[in-house]
Curated annotation (Swiss-Prot):
This is Uncharacterized protein C19G7.17. InterPro entries: SecY/SEC61-alpha (IPR002208), SecY_dom_sf (IPR023201), Translocon_Sec61/SecY_plug_dom (IPR019561). It comes from Schizosaccharomyces pombe (strain 972 / ATCC 24843) (Fission yeast). Signal peptide: none annotated. Gene3D superfamilies: SecY subunit domain. Transmembrane segments: none annotated. GO terms for molecular function: protein transmembrane transporter activity; ribosome binding; signal sequence binding. It comes from the Eukaryota. It holds the Pfam family Plug_translocon. GO terms for cellular component: Sec61 translocon complex. GO terms for biological process: post-translational protein targeting to membrane, translocation; protein insertion into ER membrane; SRP-dependent cotranslational protein targeting to membrane, translocation. SUPFAM superfamilies: Preprotein translocase SecY subunit.
Amino acid sequence: MGGARFINFIKPLSSLLPEVEGPKTHLELVEKLGWMAGCVVVYQILSIIPVYGAEKTDTLDPINNFRVLDGSSASGLMITGLAPIYLSSFLLQILASKKKIAVNFNLIIDRVLFQNAQKVVSALLYLILAVTYVSSGYYGSFSDLGIFRFIMLILQIFLPGIVCIYLCEIIEKGHGLGSGPVLLLGSHILGNIMWDVLSLHRYPVNESGDSQYQGALVGFAFNLFSFKNKFSSLRSILFRSEGLSFVQFLVCIAVFATFMYTLNIRIDVPIRSSRVRGVRQNFPLKLLYTSVIPLIYFYSILSHLLVFAYALYSLCPNSLITRLLVQYSPIDTFAEHKLQLVGGLVYFLYPPLGLSEALLHPVHTVIYTITLICITIYFSLLWMNATAGGPRDVLLFFKENQLVIAGYREATMLKELEKIIPIAAKLSAFFVSILSVIAGIFASTFGVGVLIASALVYASFEMIVGANTSLGNGN
């Protein structure tokens, strides 16, 4: 009954967020790709348009490097990123799978209400983050801003989040292919990485006027052929800390290659038809059963925690609760300007970014790694059951298609599936977590970003190839 009341409660609120209509005519693949490209362009534009009316303060970015992982922009309108959309999707999917909210996905009206509920929760999270950012003093104190600019700043941050919700819905309603958040986050990470690899922008590194190229590959090539002192010039680009170094670029390539290789690792479960004798095939059970989804949901929660922790630190810096939860140390050098987490409970949820960070703070590294593995394994099992990937769901699929596992009777198949499928989900989360920790240590958020982007871009690529194959077959 509580679940039914929740769905009915969402119904009047959903009228505030009108539904996007699906295409009225059949769209060709090229048209869908055009819609997807258009949504990506709009999202990128929102990420670079500055916030109007903000005070020019010396406030340091509390999230800094982590923004590449949550789709946010430190100075643009999309400062809240995609974390609210991912978090709302995860929470409602889990609640529905646990029967905490009553949703019958066989009914169109319930599916529509559930999608509207995700939009409403996403919008509420965007509003909460917008109020939190402005209240924290990130854009200036309330006394300097005044009530009008205070409200205007909140609206400027909140409304792009609503636009982002609709960009995702446009893609998922049939105008595009696959998942909207997957496409937008993948494009955001990929765009940031390409900029840090190939950018021709130069930035100063010291007061003497020396500068370097933003792009690691461009900088390496320039330093290799432009300076007589090769050792000194190459060292500055190979191991720099204020941007993507060339060594980190090589680590990113290794992370990409490792992930793409493991995509093909699987166990083939032999199955046969219960109706036609002699017909055998394999049911592939991938090592990356839940891919990077648990990791993304962990980061979406962490993104919210970082914003709330920063607001608490800004408003009550000396309180006992603040010191227990979060402690910052400002890094304000000529080349770097950021707030770095150095203590508190939230600190142990933040990844060690850099080899020196991991070696100098081994307790943090160990606690974070163990915590990440435990949380992602738990999320992986939750997501497995929430998305019809659990043992009972697979068994139902077999029964509907009159398939049985070779060597097992229909009555004993569930026990076998309950052995192998949860193990696959746990191994998937464990491997992705370990790879993300290694990538973070040796290539900062660039390495973790490559890991996530590889999975998201590959998922989008599979959708495009599948759609193209269907069109080629006349479906």
